[in-house]
């Protein structure tokens, strides 16, 4: 037995030797040292996050009075700046991705503007911001050592200064004559002329507000150095009322615009004085900027969705609510499912519209109560991306939008508001008979090689003031490009009809807005006498 074990041991050693030796010498295998419970090696570092592309903001700056593009406007956002070209267009392409950025618009002779964008946090995000700017209403020079009133002709707006009340930033007295620039801001005619986004600073963030009129005032000395009120002094401002509300409150808070935060900040109050139509809100201020007679309002939410012409939900669409019975705006973006929830003033009338860079939706009017409400169907972006908005002042009380369609018998107005689903593929949202508007006409489709006509009728038949003095305003949005029309010369007591423009289409249904700008005693007639319009899908 022992001999067998000995032979087996020799065989085992021979087999090991045949396998080769190690560091312990020929014929032997070096076993690894025993493990001492060493920790496992660390995992490899995670890959770097993908580099985000810069955001882009583009748009057009227009003159708020005539809709023409404004060149040489400096546009600044997040440390990036650009200058508008000849037609007012601009593009900022190197904006770091952010939740939102504040855009500032400035040019000599124009009232400064400002607007916060929607979210730009995604890589390569982009948005379109079109902004109207008001020309300065009155510029005058005076001796700052004497008391002085800066009066705006044709308006109740005014700034009253006491003697020797202005100072340079270093506290010194101004050199030479003082130059004042004062401009009333009337948001009831165009809510977009107001700087900012109708948001006031509030505890915990911001709150929506409505405006009853605003005033921009700035002062410089002979060297062009900006001036403001000296410490311990004040000035009186009078703000011309401008509101879509049927009743002006006897007293409202005063807010000034913070150009750093993009929010309105409450400081003081103003009381309603004078006799209509020459009323004004009067208050006392301790510094100059844009001052607004405002109030924060309680809100409810309008819930809904946005879809394209094919019925697919649209994410990232901008949805805005605009007051019809109050002067204010609110906006939001649709989520990944194309859903939105936007604020409106409680117990009010407002309309809601969705836009993308090149499309616009229908604009339903909503009567809000004290509870959140849901729209009956999705807002539908139209392929034509064309809409017309009519606004006006308190008088005449009733102006009417009229659109002549692609076929001879198509007339969209208060008695036949049209349809977006069937011909004429044009719809008027509502007939506003109580001043201000807005009335919005939306085009779902356009026909090939046709001429559409748009005109405004003074249904009230009153001319003190008429459409010119009201003033009436027509804004056309054509695939993101905006054109604004104000009444031309030539209105008289017999010219109820303002033929504003025609829309001409080509074989591909591309639309061109052709100004007409004529007051007429009789309504325009359709240029298309057939009924066989061919629509583009």
PLM regions: where:
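Bacterial Sec-dependent N-terminal signal peptides
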Residues: 13-54
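Extracellular beta-sheet/turn segments enriched in Thr/Pro/Gly and aliphatic residues
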Residues: 49, 118-141, 276-279, 284-295, ...
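Structural motif
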Residues: 50-71, 303-317, 322, 390-395
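Short, surface-exposed beta-strand/beta-hairpin micro-motifs centered on an aromatic residue
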Residues: 81, 85-94, 330-331, 335-344, ...
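Proteolytic cleavage junctions
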Residues: 87, 130-154, 173, 186-190, ...
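Short Pro-Gly-centered beta-turn/loop motif in secreted/extracellular proteins
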Residues: 91-100, 240-246, 339-350, 442-450, ...
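A short, solvent-exposed loop/turn motif at the edges and junctions
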Residues: 96-123, 132-134, 347-370
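Intrinsic-disorder/low-complexity signal
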Residues: 379-537
